[in-house]
Amino acid sequence: MAKGKDVRVTIILECTSCVRNDIKKESAGISRYITQKNRHNTPSRLELRKFCPYCFKHTIHGEIKK
């Protein structure tokens, strides 16, 4: 039997350096990735190194609220 439907949830990862640069208006935009995570394995906020096309380098992308 299934233990629950809400184990895997869809999350949005946002570039942390673009958010900081947005105050200075240096960046052309904010990079965002959509992915899924398992709530039982990772209950805390997820942070991954992904490529940011606005910064032109790999940066830390953190989970944001919907």
From Swiss-Prot:
Keywords: Chloroplast, Plastid, Ribonucleoprotein, Ribosomal protein. One of its GO terms (molecular function) is structural constituent of ribosome. It comes from the Eukaryota. One of its GO terms (cellular component) is chloroplast. Pfam families: Ribosomal_L33. It is found in: Plastid, Chloroplast. GO terms for biological process: translation. HAMAP family: Ribosomal_bL33 (MF_00294). Belongs to the bacterial ribosomal protein bL33 family. This is Large ribosomal subunit protein bL33c. It comes from Arabis hirsuta.
